[in-house]
From Swiss-Prot:
Pfam family, one: Maf1
Gene that produces this protein: maf1
Name under which the protein is recorded: Repressor of RNA polymerase III transcription MAF1 homolog
Family of the protein in this entry: Belongs to the MAF1 family.
Keyword terms of this UniProt record: Cytoplasm, Nucleus, Repressor, Transcription, Transcription regulation
Protein backbone atom coordinates (compact mmCIF):
# COMPACT_ATOMS: atom_id res chain seq x y z
CA UNK A 1 0.00 0.00 0.00
CA UNK A 2 1.34 3.39 -0.94
CA UNK A 3 0.15 6.65 0.58
CA UNK A 4 -0.93 8.99 -2.21
CA UNK A 5 -0.37 12.72 -1.95
CA UNK A 6 -3.55 14.78 -1.85
CA UNK A 7 -3.37 18.49 -1.07
CA UNK A 8 -7.13 18.70 -0.45
CA UNK A 9 -6.91 15.98 2.21
CA UNK A 10 -3.93 17.71 3.82
CA UNK A 11 -5.92 20.94 4.09
CA UNK A 12 -8.93 19.11 5.55
CA UNK A 13 -6.79 17.17 8.03
CA UNK A 14 -5.43 20.43 9.41
CA UNK A 15 -9.04 21.38 10.22
CA UNK A 16 -10.02 17.99 11.66
CA UNK A 17 -8.36 18.72 14.99
CA UNK A 18 -11.06 20.57 16.90
CA UNK A 19 -11.21 21.44 20.61
CA UNK A 20 -14.73 21.92 21.95
CA UNK A 21 -14.07 22.79 25.59
CA UNK A 22 -14.52 19.37 27.18
CA UNK A 23 -13.21 17.16 24.36
CA UNK A 24 -10.88 17.16 21.39
CA UNK A 25 -11.74 15.78 17.93
CA UNK A 26 -8.79 14.26 16.06
CA UNK A 27 -9.36 13.00 12.53
CA UNK A 28 -7.56 12.36 9.28
CA UNK A 29 -8.30 11.23 5.72
CA UNK A 30 -5.69 9.34 3.70
CA UNK A 31 -5.63 7.85 0.21
CA UNK A 32 -3.79 4.60 -0.55
CA UNK A 33 -2.98 2.77 -3.76
CA UNK A 34 -3.76 -0.97 -3.66
CA UNK A 35 -0.97 -1.78 -6.12
CA UNK A 36 1.43 -4.11 -4.33
CA UNK A 37 5.18 -3.70 -4.37
CA UNK A 38 8.11 -4.89 -2.26
CA UNK A 39 7.08 -5.80 1.28
CA UNK A 40 3.38 -5.90 0.34
CA UNK A 41 3.95 -8.82 -2.04
CA UNK A 42 5.78 -10.80 0.64
CA UNK A 43 3.10 -10.05 3.23
CA UNK A 44 0.36 -11.04 0.78
CA UNK A 45 2.13 -14.33 0.05
CA UNK A 46 2.20 -15.13 3.77
CA UNK A 47 -1.42 -14.02 4.15
CA UNK A 48 -2.52 -16.39 1.38
CA UNK A 49 -1.06 -19.38 3.20
CA UNK A 50 -4.25 -19.30 5.30
CA UNK A 51 -6.53 -19.21 2.24
CA UNK A 52 -6.60 -18.31 -1.43
CA UNK A 53 -7.26 -14.68 -2.50
CA UNK A 54 -10.67 -15.49 -4.04
CA UNK A 55 -11.97 -17.26 -0.91
CA UNK A 56 -14.72 -15.24 0.80
CA UNK A 57 -14.38 -14.17 4.43
CA UNK A 58 -17.42 -13.57 6.65
CA UNK A 59 -17.69 -10.09 8.13
CA UNK A 60 -19.50 -8.86 11.22
CA UNK A 61 -22.80 -7.02 10.80
CA UNK A 62 -22.62 -3.21 10.83
CA UNK A 63 -22.90 -1.77 14.32
CA UNK A 64 -26.02 0.06 13.19
CA UNK A 65 -27.91 -3.18 12.54
CA UNK A 66 -29.00 -3.68 16.15
CA UNK A 67 -28.52 -7.46 15.99
CA UNK A 68 -28.91 -9.21 19.33
CA UNK A 69 -26.01 -11.39 20.60
CA UNK A 70 -28.27 -14.48 20.47
CA UNK A 71 -29.15 -13.90 16.82
CA UNK A 72 -25.52 -13.16 16.06
CA UNK A 73 -24.52 -16.49 17.60
CA UNK A 74 -27.00 -18.35 15.38
CA UNK A 75 -25.74 -16.51 12.32
CA UNK A 76 -22.23 -17.73 13.06
CA UNK A 77 -23.49 -21.31 13.06
CA UNK A 78 -25.79 -21.04 10.06
CA UNK A 79 -23.67 -18.81 7.84
CA UNK A 80 -26.81 -16.78 7.13
CA UNK A 81 -28.52 -13.60 8.24
CA UNK A 82 -26.43 -10.70 9.52
CA UNK A 83 -23.10 -12.33 8.64
CA UNK A 84 -24.06 -12.89 5.02
CA UNK A 85 -21.84 -9.93 4.10
CA UNK A 86 -18.51 -11.24 2.89
CA UNK A 87 -15.41 -10.01 1.13
CA UNK A 88 -12.58 -11.78 -0.63
CA UNK A 89 -9.38 -12.45 1.27
CA UNK A 90 -7.62 -10.12 -1.14
CA UNK A 91 -9.93 -7.26 -0.13
CA UNK A 92 -9.42 -8.20 3.52
CA UNK A 93 -5.67 -7.99 2.98
CA UNK A 94 -6.07 -4.48 1.54
CA UNK A 95 -8.00 -3.37 4.63
CA UNK A 96 -5.42 -4.82 7.03
CA UNK A 97 -2.51 -3.41 5.02
CA UNK A 98 -4.15 0.03 5.09
CA UNK A 99 -4.39 -0.11 8.90
CA UNK A 100 -0.75 -1.18 9.16
CA UNK A 101 0.39 1.66 6.92
CA UNK A 102 -1.77 4.29 8.61
CA UNK A 103 -0.80 3.42 12.21
CA UNK A 104 2.80 2.40 11.53
CA UNK A 105 5.03 1.87 13.51
CA UNK A 106 2.99 1.90 16.72
CA UNK A 107 0.55 -0.92 15.88
CA UNK A 108 0.60 -4.24 14.05
CA UNK A 109 -2.70 -5.51 12.60
CA UNK A 110 -1.35 -8.70 11.01
CA UNK A 111 -3.54 -10.87 13.27
CA UNK A 112 -6.72 -8.98 12.42
CA UNK A 113 -9.56 -11.17 11.12
CA UNK A 114 -12.63 -10.72 8.95
CA UNK A 115 -14.96 -10.47 11.95
CA UNK A 116 -13.20 -7.24 12.99
CA UNK A 117 -14.64 -5.56 9.89
CA UNK A 118 -18.14 -4.77 8.65
CA UNK A 119 -19.50 -3.80 5.27
CA UNK A 120 -21.60 -0.66 5.58
CA UNK A 121 -25.13 -0.55 4.09
CA UNK A 122 -24.59 2.42 1.76
CA UNK A 123 -22.67 5.61 1.11
CA UNK A 124 -25.68 7.57 2.35
CA UNK A 125 -25.69 5.70 5.66
CA UNK A 126 -22.00 6.44 6.26
CA UNK A 127 -22.52 10.06 5.18
CA UNK A 128 -25.25 10.47 7.82
CA UNK A 129 -23.33 8.58 10.52
CA UNK A 130 -20.17 10.67 10.09
CA UNK A 131 -22.07 13.96 9.92
CA UNK A 132 -24.14 13.06 12.97
CA UNK A 133 -21.07 12.24 15.10
CA UNK A 134 -19.01 15.25 14.06
CA UNK A 135 -21.88 17.75 14.10
CA UNK A 136 -22.88 16.70 17.62
CA UNK A 137 -19.30 16.97 18.87
CA UNK A 138 -17.91 19.94 16.92
CA UNK A 139 -21.02 21.92 15.94
CA UNK A 140 -20.39 24.93 13.72
CA UNK A 141 -16.70 24.09 13.27
CA UNK A 142 -17.69 20.93 11.40
CA UNK A 143 -20.67 22.42 9.55
CA UNK A 144 -18.27 24.76 7.71
CA UNK A 145 -15.96 21.84 6.86
CA UNK A 146 -18.59 19.28 5.86
CA UNK A 147 -19.16 20.26 2.17
CA UNK A 148 -15.43 20.54 1.51
CA UNK A 149 -14.75 17.17 3.13
CA UNK A 150 -17.29 15.16 1.12
CA UNK A 151 -16.45 16.93 -2.12
CA UNK A 152 -12.77 16.01 -1.68
CA UNK A 153 -13.69 12.41 -0.84
CA UNK A 154 -15.88 12.07 -3.91
CA UNK A 155 -13.24 13.59 -6.18
CA UNK A 156 -10.56 11.18 -4.91
CA UNK A 157 -12.50 7.92 -4.72
CA UNK A 158 -15.83 8.36 -6.61
CA UNK A 159 -18.18 7.53 -3.75
CA UNK A 160 -20.92 6.05 -5.97
CA UNK A 161 -18.52 3.28 -7.05
CA UNK A 162 -17.29 2.42 -3.57
CA UNK A 163 -17.78 -0.47 -1.21
CA UNK A 164 -17.44 0.91 2.30
CA UNK A 165 -16.04 -1.09 5.20
CA UNK A 166 -15.50 -0.22 8.85
CA UNK A 167 -13.03 -1.51 11.42
CA UNK A 168 -14.70 -2.29 14.75
CA UNK A 169 -12.14 -4.02 17.00
CA UNK A 170 -12.39 -5.21 20.57
CA UNK A 171 -10.75 -3.03 23.22
CA UNK A 172 -7.46 -4.95 23.18
CA UNK A 173 -7.00 -4.41 19.43
CA UNK A 174 -8.27 -0.83 19.28
CA UNK A 175 -5.57 1.77 18.57
CA UNK A 176 -7.90 4.25 20.27
CA UNK A 177 -8.61 2.05 23.27
CA UNK A 178 -6.89 4.21 25.87
CA UNK A 179 -8.72 5.82 28.79
CA UNK A 180 -10.48 9.02 27.84
CA UNK A 181 -11.51 8.01 24.34
CA UNK A 182 -15.22 8.84 23.99
CA UNK A 183 -15.91 7.45 20.51
CA UNK A 184 -14.15 6.68 17.26
CA UNK A 185 -14.79 5.46 13.74
CA UNK A 186 -12.63 3.92 11.00
CA UNK A 187 -14.08 3.83 7.47
CA UNK A 188 -12.51 2.42 4.30
CA UNK A 189 -13.86 3.65 0.95
CA UNK A 190 -12.72 0.98 -1.53
CA UNK A 191 -12.94 1.57 -5.28
CA UNK A 192 -12.01 -1.67 -7.03
CA UNK A 193 -11.76 -0.05 -10.47
CA UNK A 194 -9.33 2.61 -9.27
CA UNK A 195 -7.47 0.09 -7.07
CA UNK A 196 -7.58 2.65 -4.31
CA UNK A 197 -8.74 2.96 -0.69
CA UNK A 198 -9.50 6.17 1.16
CA UNK A 199 -9.21 5.69 4.92
CA UNK A 200 -11.16 8.07 7.17
CA UNK A 201 -10.41 7.70 10.87
CA UNK A 202 -11.57 9.97 13.68
CA UNK A 203 -11.91 9.96 17.47
CA UNK A 204 -13.13 12.15 20.28
CA UNK A 205 -11.01 12.35 23.43
CA UNK A 206 -12.09 13.78 26.78
CA UNK A 207 -9.81 16.59 27.92
CA UNK A 208 -10.50 15.60 31.52
CA UNK A 209 -9.71 11.88 31.20
CA UNK A 210 -6.89 11.85 28.63
CA UNK A 211 -3.84 9.80 29.70
CA UNK A 212 -0.73 11.73 30.74
CA UNK A 213 1.34 10.63 27.74
CA UNK A 214 -1.25 11.74 25.18
CA UNK A 215 -0.30 15.43 25.33
CA UNK A 216 -4.00 16.30 25.59
CA UNK A 217 -4.85 18.53 28.52
CA UNK A 218 -1.19 19.37 29.14
CA UNK A 219 -1.81 23.13 29.07
CA UNK A 220 -4.52 22.80 31.71
CA UNK A 221 -2.23 20.68 33.90
CA UNK A 222 0.55 23.27 33.58
CA UNK A 223 -1.80 26.08 34.60
CA UNK A 224 -2.93 24.11 37.65
CA UNK A 225 0.65 23.22 38.57
CA UNK A 226 1.74 26.86 38.24
CA UNK A 227 -1.15 27.91 40.45
CA UNK A 228 -0.17 25.38 43.12
CA UNK A 229 3.45 26.54 42.91
CA UNK A 230 2.45 30.18 43.40
CA UNK A 231 0.33 29.27 46.44
CA UNK A 232 3.23 27.30 47.91
CA UNK A 233 5.62 30.24 47.37
CA UNK A 234 3.18 32.63 49.06
CA UNK A 235 2.90 30.24 52.00
CA UNK A 236 6.68 30.07 52.38
CA UNK A 237 6.94 33.88 52.31
CA UNK A 238 4.29 34.17 55.04
CA UNK A 239 6.22 31.72 57.22
CA UNK A 240 9.44 33.73 56.72
CA UNK A 241 7.68 36.99 57.73
CA UNK A 242 6.19 35.30 60.79
CA UNK A 243 9.61 33.96 61.78
CA UNK A 244 11.20 37.39 61.42
CA UNK A 245 8.56 39.01 63.65
CA UNK A 246 9.03 36.40 66.36
CA UNK A 247 12.78 36.93 66.29
Amino acid sequence: MKLLENSSFEAINSLLTIETGDCKIIGRIESYSCKMAGDDKQMFKQFCQEGQPHVLEALSPPQSSGISPNKLSHSLDDGEGPLSDKCSRKTLFYLIATLNESFRPDYDFSRTKGHDFSKEPSVNWVFNAVNSSLSAAAGEAYSHLQPQLWEALDKEISLAECDIYSYNPDLDSDPYGEEGNLWSFNYFFYNKRLKRIVFFTCRSVSLFMAPRDSGIGTELDLELDEGSYEEEEEGNMDEERYGALCA
